[in-house]
């Protein structure tokens, strides 16, 4: 009977191949579920979530312009931004670990620039990229000590890394010590 079956059918009859095929067709893990507080009725784009998973940033249309909106995922409540409403449209939101810092690209006149809002102190930190190139996308490191900027430079894409350690205080996961001279009890 083996001789009558094509080689590929003989391979499929083996239990290991059957199991592997089933895994590929069904997926490797449990089905993802919608998190509470994670959905609103507005059209949303470019999601970014804080490292702690507690704050969501999305772009929504306000007065015909993309505007960043923050939401506390524990309560479902919107969170205010202090400086960003003056400079729109927004693009490419990125959050630090606890959501203290929100980085976004804004439009000021005919120039695009990266701005980081410190939600704890209320300060805005406008950043110009070296060479004064227009930013296209950005990504803030979880501790807010580095910013990766994709820029357009004479028709070519380039990524620039900015060191923010002299500008921003680090945003570390809760309970993480910076240093200690005393032994832990």
Tell me the role of every PLM-derived stretch.
Residues 47-55, 93-101, 138-146, 182-185:
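Blade-terminus and WD-like Trp-Asp/Gly-His loop motifs, strongest in beta-propeller folds
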Residues 65-69, 111-115, 156-162:
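Structural motif
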Residues 57-63, 103-109, 148-154:
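Beta-strand C-termini and the immediately following turn/loop, strongest in propeller blades
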Residues 37-42, 82-87, 128-131, 175:
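Surface loop/turn motifs at the tips and blade-to-blade linkers of beta-strand repeat domains
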Residues 39-82:
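Post-signal-peptide N-terminal segment of Sec-exported extracytoplasmic proteins
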Residues 25-27:
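C-terminal motif of bacterial Sec signal peptides marking the signal peptidase cleavage site
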Residues 73-76, 118-122, 164-165:
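Short loop/turn segments that connect beta-strands within beta-propeller blades
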Residues 29-31:
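Bacterial signal peptide processing site
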């Amino acid at each position: 009977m083996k001789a009558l079956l094509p080689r590929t059918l003989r391979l499929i009859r083996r239990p290991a191949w059957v199991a592997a095929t089933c895994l590929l067709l069904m997926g490797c893990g449990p089905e993802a579920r919608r998190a509470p507080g994670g959905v609103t009725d507005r059209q949303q784009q470019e999601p970014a979530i804080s490292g702690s998973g507690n704050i969501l940033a999305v772009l929504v249309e306000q007065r015909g312009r993309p505007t960043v909106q923050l939401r506390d995922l524990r309560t479902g409540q919107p969170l205010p931004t202090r400086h960003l409403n003056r400079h729109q449209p927004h693009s490419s939101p990125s959050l630090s670990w606890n959501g203290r810092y929100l980085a976004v690209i804004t439009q000021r006149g005919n120039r695009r620039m990266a701005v980081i809002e410190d939600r704890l102190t209320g300060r805005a930190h406008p950043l110009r990229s070296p060479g004064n190139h227009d930013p296209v996308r950005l990504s803030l490191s979880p501790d807010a000590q580095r910013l990766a900027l994709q820029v357009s430079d004479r028709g070519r894409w380039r990524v620039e890394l900015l060191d923010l350690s002299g500008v921003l205080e680090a945003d570390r996961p809760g309970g993480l010590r910076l240093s200690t001279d005393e032994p832990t009890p």
